[in-house]
Amino acid sequence: MPEGKKLPPAPMLRLLVFAQTGLIVTLLAVVGAYFAPRAGLEDPFLLAFAQGEGADLWELLRPQLLAGLLVGAPGAAVFLAGYYVVFRPWLDDATVVEEVLIRWGLLSLLAWLISLLTPGGGVTATGVWLSILVSGIAFAAGHAPSYAAAGCKLTPRFWTAMLVLNLWVSLYCGWLFWQHGLAAAIVAHMLVHAAWLPLDLRVARRATT
């Protein structure tokens, strides 16, 4: 914050953050709804729900939840091990960017755009993996300015930690979205934060004692 300037009142900041997040989520949700089917990334549960079909929605959702748990639990364990064992000792007071990758919008759009460049205009496995990789890099890099404004030092070590850890989560959550649907990716992503928050609070308490 430049010297002599003050932050807006807390209620105003919360309103601005809420409005910004709502606008981005709405925009990318619309993008995903349009491009996901065109990129071969349809979600059977969301499709049946939106069309009001009489199918058993739980039967469509259950395999996504199971896949999210089976992949998300070991995925979160690797993320936390990488953060606390490898990267956290490097980072001073900085933190790893929280991964909130909007696969439904950004990944679907990238996969569709890449399909336009392939012979016959089809979606390929290589194209989807490239979309997962690029969206993960874009997400990590796009949040760097806000972390810099919060006082984080954007050192090479910070960039390395931010990119490696975000890309790890992006790979398995992107694969879950591609193969099983959005709910599977959401469950896996939630597991990272469900395990990360209490562990990080415990580490922080130890550091202050």
PLM regions: where:
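Specific transmembrane helices
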Residues: M1-L91, L107, A111, S115, ...
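Transmembrane helix-loop-helix hairpins at the membrane interface
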Residues: D92-T209
